[in-house]
Each structure stands twice: as C-alpha cells, then as structure tokens.
Regions:
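Anionic-ligand-binding alpha/beta catalytic cores of soluble enzymes and soluble regulatory domains
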Residues: 252-293
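Long, charge-rich alpha-helical interaction segments
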Residues: 226-228, 232-265
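Intrinsically disordered, low-complexity linkers and terminal tails enriched in Pro/Gly
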Residues: 1-2, 295
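Conserved small/polar residues in nucleotide/adenosyl-binding loops
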Residues: 298-305
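Active-site region of the double-stranded beta-helix
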Residues: 2-20, 33-186, 194-236, 241
Length: 305
C-alpha cells in the first residue's frame, strides 16, 4: 500500500497540516487511507498478548473496580472469561512483530524517522475504552475495523485533576469540544496535552501511531550519563587563584560560578550532543523484540466464545 503524503490529509495537504495543526490542534481526516483493511486479525492480536516478550494490557470499564487494569502476558483462557462488552486490549509495538503493520510507517515519513515511537493496536468490545485522558506526545489514531466514537476535550497539564485510580491516569473532568465516529480508513490526529476519549460502538480495532517526545528530564539524565562515560577521571573541579574565604563553612558564589562554567562547557559540546542524540533516538523501544520475532509463534485464541 503506497499513497502520497498529501493524500493522507485530503484537501489540507501535508504542508498545511504541519504549519497549522502539528502540535497545535486536533484534525479529523475522513478516509485518510481509503479502503483500509486491518493488517492483523483480532485473534492474532490476542495471541500476541499471551507472549512474554510483548507489552500488553486489558482495561475493563467495570472490573473488580472501575477502570481495572490487567497486565500481560495473559493465560490462554483469558478471553473466554471476559464479559461480552466494556473492555479493551492494547498491544504495544505491534510494528516490531508484524511486517505488514510496520509498512504503515512509510505513510508518515513526512516527519523525521527518529520521531516515530511505535504502533500500538487496541481491540475493543462495544463500550470499551481506556477512559478520558491526555498524552504528552503526538498520536495519529487510524481506525482499522469497526466503529469508535471519539470525543475531544480541553488542553490539559500535570495540574489537571484525575480520578483516584491506582494504575491509570483518567481525567476527572472532561470538557467535550468535538465528537466524531470513526470508520475504517478514517484518522484522527491528537496533539500533546489534548484530552480525548474513545469508546467502541462496535467490536473495533484502532491503530495508534505515536511519536517520541523525550522529556527534558530524560534528555538531561541520558546525555549527562553519556558525557560522564566519556570523561577522564583526571578532569576535575579546579580553583587556581582562589581567594581566602571569609567563611570556611560557606560555598561562596565564585565556586558556584566556576562549577557552572564547567557544566556549561561540557553540555555545550554540540558534536557530543549530536552523537548521543542519534544513538538515543534511533534505539529500538524494545530491542529484545528483534530477536524474539524470529522465533515467535502466533497463538490464536478466540477473544470470546
């Protein structure tokens, strides 16, 4: 399946999308991929969730408590024991297991490849979803089969109130601003921080193409770790020409200035930053899966009797 980037966004086109929508506001694209058919069967997706190497979750709207989270891998009889509705299965990094799913990433090469995270696929029974929430990254939601109703809400932050839930970050307040039902081939773009809530109207499958957005904390921690690994133990704090302190128990401003200059000099090495960033952002999210794929056998339990 090959399409031009512009056709993915209909009349808007990729350039206008990047200028007006990317990281700014949601966009619904009807028939972004006309005639799209899911690249994986429901039973295959369920089979992946049984494997030790695969990150998977099941969320029940009404389980042992509201919005119960269950972590995979799951036993073989899991899907025979679930209710008829109001639950969803989520499987991460399906693109690392199924080449046909990975091929979808070619449609998003109008953005740098290092920004791509993975393709998560969710299967939901009627009423199933993960609750109203927001993400800190960009995501395209491509409908694989069935119908899902999406509500778009307010801009959120870490200060947005959440429900009391031990495992999930579900918004306590949701200000619905738009609402659409997506069918196969339809796609919804959600920028970071925008509240959204998807509920299955029929048995359905949704492809979530997520994009990496490293936090400043992640950048600082990993880059300084990289720098530290390449520094000689002989490179140390120095204070030649230091003046006699007025208070020996105090750390004087001059010491802080020298320390700051040392840190700034180290982190200002653009060549080192580029080398680290290239390695960090092109590392597979689940490097162990590359080997696991070669020996993984799909199991195909029926989601329900």
């Amino acid at each position: 399946m090959t399409i031009e980037f512009d056709s993915l966004f209909g009349d808007i086109g990729v350039d206008r999308f990047l200028a007006e929508y990317w990281q700014r506001k949601p966009l619904l694209i009807r028939q972004a991929i006309p005639g799209f058919e899911s690249q994986i069967e429901t039973n295959e997706l369920a089979g992946l969730s049984l494997e030790e190497e695969v990150e998977s979750r099941i969320i029940l709207k009404e389980g042992s408590h509201p919005w119960e989270l269950r972590q995979g891998p799951f036993p073989d009889d899991t899907y025979q024991q679930l209710p008829e509705r109001d639950w969803t299965l989520l499987v991460q990094a399906v693109d690392q297991f199924v080449p046909e799913v990975a091929d979808l990433l070619a449609q998003f090469r109008f953005l740098p490849s290092w920004r791509v995270d993975d393709i998560m696929i969710s299967y939901a029974t009627p009423g199933g979803g993960v609750g109203p929430h927001y993400d800190n990254y960009d995501v395209f939601l491509l409908q694989g089969h069935g119908k899902r109703r999406w509500r778009i809400g307010q801009q959120c932050s870490e200060d947005s109130p959440l429900l009391e839930n031990p495992d999930l970050r579900i918004l306590a307040e949701f200000d619905c601003q738009d609402e659409w039902v997506l069918e196969p081939g339809d796609m919804l773009y959600i920028p970071p921080g925008v509240a959204h809530d998807g509920v299955a109207e029929t048995d359905c499958m949704t492809y979530s193409i997520g994009f990496r957005a490293p936090s400043h904390a992640e950048i600082l921690v990993h880059f300084t770790d990289y720098l530290a690994h390449h520094l000689s133990d002989d490179q140390r704090y120095g204070d030649a020409g230091v003046n006699r302190p007025s208070d020996p128990a105090a750390i004087d401003p001059a010491a802080i200035d020298r320390l700051q200059q040392s840190v700034l000099r180290l982190v200002s090495d653009k060549e080192a930053l580029a080398t680290w960033f290239g390695r960090h952002m092109t590392e597979a999210k689940y490097p162990e899966l590359a080997q696991a794929y070669a020996c993984l056998l799909y199991t195909s339990p029926s989601p329900r009797d």
